[in-house]
C-alpha cells in the first residue's frame, strides 16, 4: 500500500515500518506484481490496515479500498481486528468480489483512539 497521496512510497519503505517486516513486505509486493500478470488463476490480494489487532472485536462491519492506499476508518484509524479481516476474506471468497484485485480492509470503527 502507498504511504501517502504521492503514490511513490510504499508503507514498508517508511522509516517507522518495523525492520523485521521490511523483507516480508517487499516479497509480498513482488508477489502482487507477479499476480497482476497471471491470467490462468483467479486471485484476490488482501491487505490489512496498518494496525492489525489480534484482540480486537469481531464486528463483521468493515470497509475496503482498491486504490492501493491505506484504509482509514470512520474513527480516523488504519485499524482492523483479526476477526474482521477473516470475515472479509471469507466474504470475498464466497461472493466472488475483488477478483484479480488488491483490496485493503479496515474495521469500520475502532483503533487506538476509538
Residue ranges and their predicted role:
Residues 1-114:
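Oxidoreductase cofactor-interface core, primarily capturing Rossmann-like NAD(P)-dependent enzymes
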